[in-house]
Amino acid sequence: MAAPAEAEVAAAPGLTEAAEAAELTRALSRLLPGLETESKLGRRRALEALEQVLEEAVRPGADSAAFQGPWARLLLPRLLRLLSDPAEGCRALAAHLLDLGLRRAARPRDALPRLLPALSARLARPELARPPPEPCEELRLALVQLLHLAVDLGGAALAPHLDDAVRALRAALLDPFAAVRREGCECAAALARATPEHFHMQSESLIGPLMQTISHQHWKVRVAVIEATGTVIQFGSGNSVDDVLSHFAQRLFDDVPQVRQAVTSVVGGWLLNLRDRYSFLHKLTPLLLSSFSDEMPEIRQTATSLWEKVGLQWQQENEADLKDKLDFASPPPPNYPEHESRPGLGCRELVFRNLSKVLPAICHDITDWVVGTRVKAAQLLPVLLLHAEDHITQHLEIVLRTLHQACTDEEKAVVGSCIRAAELIGTFVSPEVFLKLILAMLKKAPSASGLLILASVIRGCPRNALQPHVTVIATELAQEHICQGSENNLYLEHLLLCVQALLSVCQEDCRAASLQFLEVLVTIMAVSDAVGLEKKAQKTMDTLAEVEDIPSSQDLYRKHVGALLERLTASHGEWAVHSVQLLKFTVLLTQAGPAVGEALQHVIPTLRACLQPSTDPHMRLKLFSILSMMLLRPKDTVDSQGQFRGYLDMVINDILAPNLQWHAGRTAAAIRTAAISCLWALISSDILSAKQVQEAQETLMPQVLATLEDDSQTTRLMSCRIINMFLKNSGDTMEPEKFLKVYPELLKRLDDVSNDVRMAAASALLTWLKCIESLDGKSAYQSSVQFLYRELLVHLDDPESAIQDTVLEVLKEGSVLFPDVLVRETEAVVHKHRSATYCEQLLQHMQTMAAAR
């Protein structure tokens, strides 16, 4: 009896399953005819009734095996037909019921042969130009979600149906509705994971639609496309990597960080897991390393972490080849950047072994017409150099050529990255190598970018390696074709950077090249028209003085001014106003201070040669201006050593005298003004003895008297003052004939248009009168003095009270010579004056003086 009982119990589940299936079949059979009715409302009500039945069937605890038969036999074919129903509501309910049925069915994969063609038919467009068969966006989304569900439930069973699935996905990936595209991306990735052994046969057909969608306006769609592409290629054909690289590279410029993060993660995943990844190392590595320079710390951290894993994995896979390098690890190069951590051996080897393939593309992109491309390529270059280290030597020529071009970029970010790259070259490459190339480049065509590269490599170079080359570099920089290669401020600024870099790196080692450095700095100060640059050059000169261990830049000039002037003045015969040599000469004269007095043997002969009437007038004006400034401070300039008197004859006879001669023209007048100003500065200083002033007067008095008629007010004023000075120092020793020629010329200046000139002339006339007072035979001058009295009395009635006051003082002082004569002359004209006040004051003064006598 026991055996039949056990059989009955075992059969019970089967009976229950059959009973449930039969009951479900009966329930469905009552509703199915409603699906065939022509009434849209009738079909909808039938579908709604079916929905209630199915929701009851899929309740927890329901038997999926009992559901499988009625579902596959009765419902599935009818629901699939209803996906094409004219009524949108019926199609939506049909899709929903299919979703419920797939989730409940015991063997959902059995539905795939009928489901996938139906989905493909509703999603795939027969032609790209035509709209999809399913016009409703929400329904298309539901159909793609249904396809995704089928992929998740069907797994490897989808392999025979890949064509239909891929056809539907291609349409979904290009759907106008963004949500459909995102769902399509997720479904494509799921399909790749579900059919790893067969997916490669269809994967390439998805790449085209994915790449068409990768620039979609919604960033979430772009992220989904990138992630889906990563999975599709991972499980599909590696040949598609070439098709997506340019699109991925473009996404690294995306404004949305999540998109760049997705590219970084996918590329890193490929480098770790792609089956034939070794074939694409040189293509994928630049993409991952580009994220090292991303503005977002999270992306940089992701890229760094992935790259470390890639390098470590490659190192482990190639351990046999790297055995020696692993056993005898090389230390970091000297002067290794402090803020950089050295990449692992695997990472360094990966870059080094692929550098020849990567560099040409980087060097091409760094000069691209698109700004973003140039910036990215420039940022990548220092990252590569940091990995390649001294292996960059074999590629140095192409890198330097690229940097030379890129450093002219208007984008500061590009130039900044190039500077960083050049500094790394200085760190990793021997100076013998990079100097040979860079100096040859500068010798061939000096440029601002070439100098910037040189300054940068010097900054990155270790001091002990650079020390033997300091003099060579400084000498090359001091060559005319480089230090005088351009007057452009940017060029000069980069030239200054070279000097600053050498002083900063080599410090005391620069003493041997101090003269060359000074010459370069003087050139920069001479040629530059930017005040800021001149200040920087002066500050650098102070640094050079510190390196030389001397107190100041003035002492630096004192040490080298002789050699500088000797080299510089050798070509003075070829100078013009804009000659660099002349500009340098003027800088030395104005900046060297007391050192000028130690090099008069070069300064004065050069001035004599350049200040001849036959030379460039504008150059003469410039030099006279500088000479005048020096003569105003002789103890701090030309006479600092008390040697200027030895060159006085040359200054007076060969420089001043020729330039005081009258010549027609405004320029000639300006030169006379400059020359007379120099003469005034000379004789008003304390460096000349009375005898030397007398000698100057004997030589120059005729020319100075002639300049009293000059058109320039300044010239006339200076001439009056000079004559006054000559008379004070040597008037009583002049020959009578020459002495008498002075006062008529001064009298004419009392009618000058300038009151300053008139007053200076009056002062000189007073000095002339005092000179007669000191002479023994003053009676011989009575007629001349009487004439002078008469003329001065005319100006005593001048409209200008200041002139009247000045003339009155002259007459009072001069009355001591011949007071009776002056009284007669005054009384003769007093009634002619508009006001007798000044004449009465003069007469009163003479009466007082007579009483005192």
From Swiss-Prot:
HEAT repeats lie at residues 69-107, 200-238, 240-276, 278-316, 374-412, 597-636, 694-732, 736-774, 782-820. InterPro entries: ARM-like, ARM-type_fold, DAAF5, HEAT_DAAF5, TOG. Pfam families: HEAT_DAAF5. Expressed in ciliated cells including ependymal cells lining the lateral ventricles and multiciliated epithelium of oviduct ampulla. GO terms for biological process: cilium movement; inner dynein arm assembly; outer dynein arm assembly. The keyword Cytoplasm applies. The modification N-acetylalanine is found at residue 2. Keywords: Acetylation, Cilium biogenesis/degradation, Cytoplasm, Repeat. The keyword Cytoplasm applies. Transmembrane segments: none annotated. Belongs to the DNAAF5 family. Interacts with DNAI2; probably involved in outer arm dynein assembly. Cytoplasmic protein involved in the delivery of the dynein machinery to the motile cilium. It is required for the assembly of the axonemal dynein inner and outer arms, two structures attached to the peripheral outer doublet A microtubule of the axoneme, that play a crucial role in cilium motility. This is Dynein axonemal assembly factor 5. It comes from Mus musculus.
